[in-house]
Regions:
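Structural microenvironment flanking redox-active thiols in thiol-disulfide oxidoreductases
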Residues: 43-105
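Short loop/turn microsegments at loop-to-beta-strand junctions
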Residues: 5-6, 28, 122-124
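Thiol-/selenol-based redox modules, centered on thioredoxin-like
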Residues: 116-161
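A short beta-strand-turn-helix
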Residues: 8-28, 52-55
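Structural cue for short, hydrophobic secondary-structure segments
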Residues: 31-33, 65, 127
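N-terminal targeting signals for export/organelle localization
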Residues: 1-11, 156-161
Length: 161
C-alpha cells in the first residue's frame, strides 16, 4: 500500500458534485492532466481510453481524471474533452474543483505532481483498490503500462473486501 485516498468532493464534467464515496467498492485508476496540455496529457488520455476499452466487461472498474488547471477546465470544458476521448460517463469521470483540493490530492495523496511549475504534473497513473488504498503507480511512457494495469486490476478484484 502506497497511501490512502482521503474523502473528497469535487465537481464532475456534468456539473454535478462527485464524492469519493461514489468510488467505494470499486477498483479505479487515477491520473492528473489538463485539457490545454501539449505534453503527455493527450497520450495519457488515449491510454485511459484504452483502459476503458480493455476493462469494458469488468463492472467494478472506474477511471478518474483530475484536472490540475481548474481555472480553465470548467465542467463544460471537461465534458467536451471527455467526448473527444469517447469517455463512458458511467466509468470514466473528469473532475475539477477548488485549486487547493486538487493540489492536495495531486501532491499530498497521489504524489503525482512535479515540482517547479504551476501546471506541471506526473505522467504516471495510480491504481486504487476497493478500500481507497493506492496500490501501484505506472509509468505511462512504458509500452507495457496498459497490459500491466489490466493484469493488476484483475488481481485486485480477486482480493476480499
Amino acid at each position: 500500500m502506497l497511501g490512502v485516498v482521503p474523502p473528497f468532493e469535487l465537481t464532475a464534467e456534468n456539473g454535478e458534485a462527485f464524492q469519493s464515496s461514489q468510488l467505494a467498492g470499486q477498483v479505479w485508476v487515477a491520473d492528473f492532466f489538463f485539457t490545454t496540455c501539449n505534453g503527455p496529457c493527450p497520450r495519457m488520455s488515449v491510454q485511459m481510453r484504452q483502459l476503458q476499452e480493455s476493462t469494458r466487461n469488468i463492472s467494478d472498474v472506474r477511471l478518474v481524471s483530475f484536472t490540475i488547471d481548474p481555472a480553465t477546465d470548467t465542467p463544460a470544458v471537461l465534458a467536451a474533452y471527455a467526448r473527444r476521448y469517447k469517455a463512458d460517463r458511467e466509468r470514466w469521470r473528469f473532475l475539477t474543483g477548488p485549486p487547493q483540493d486538487l493540489r492536495r490530492l495531486s501532491y499530498d495523496t497521489f504524489h503525482l505532481a512535479e515540482v517547479g511549475g504551476a501546471l506541471e504534473h506526473s505522467s504516471r497513473f495510480a491504481l486504487v483498490d476497493r478500500k481507497g488504498r493506492i496500490r501501484a503507480y505506472y509509468d505511462t511512457s512504458s509500452t507495457n503500462a496498459i497490459p500491466q494495469i489490466v493484469e493488476d486490476i484483475l488481481k485486485l478484484r480477486k482480493e476480499l473486501l
